[in-house]
Amino acid sequence: MDKIVLESCRFYGYHGAFKEEQTLGQIFLVDLELSVDLQAASLSDQLTDTVHYGMVFDSVRQLVEGGKFILIERLAGAICEQLFNEFPPIEAIKVAIKKENPPIAGHYKAVGIELERQR
């Protein structure tokens, strides 16, 4: 299956189980892998034959920066639901969300989750 990929999209949001996360906010890194049939676009060179990744980015930004979820698992689920609703050609989605600086002690690059959903 063909794919459209958006990597390390950076957004500022107020999601998390800790009070500090909900009030101070933090950076969220979002990776998306969208399964889309790109056959027509690969032949036509027409934007109408694909999913516009700029519009995908804006849709995800609205959710991450405008919404508020306790769990990033729920945020990822909401991203999948919204993208399926807005972009009918998307057949499957893999979304990963990472926090680089959650309020937990320890040494790590990031913590996060990954979901895969199909229509």
From Swiss-Prot:
GO terms for biological process: folic acid biosynthetic process; tetrahydrofolate biosynthetic process. Keywords: Folate biosynthesis, Lyase. CDD domains: DHNA_DHNTPE (cd00534). The active site is at K99 (proton donor/acceptor). The keyword Lyase applies. Pathway: Cofactor biosynthesis; tetrahydrofolate biosynthesis; 2-amino-4-hydroxy-6-hydroxymethyl-7,8-dihydropteridine diphosphate from 7,8-dihydroneopterin triphosphate: step 3/4. The keyword Lyase applies. InterPro entries: Dihydroneopterin_aldolase, FolB_dom, GTP-CH-I_C/QueF. It catalyses: 7,8-dihydroneopterin = 6-hydroxymethyl-7,8-dihydropterin + glycolaldehyde. Its EC number is 4.1.2.25. It holds the Pfam family FolB. It comes from the Bacteria. One of its GO terms (molecular function) is dihydroneopterin aldolase activity. One of its GO terms (cellular component) is cytoplasm. It is an enzyme of class 4 (lyase). Coiled coil: none annotated. Substrate binds at E21, Y53, I72, E73. Belongs to the DHNA family. PANTHER family: DIHYDRONEOPTERIN ALDOLASE 1-RELATED. Catalyzes the conversion of 7,8-dihydroneopterin to 6-hydroxymethyl-7,8-dihydropterin. This is Dihydroneopterin aldolase. It comes from Streptococcus pyogenes serotype M6 (strain ATCC BAA-946 / MGAS10394). The gene is folB.
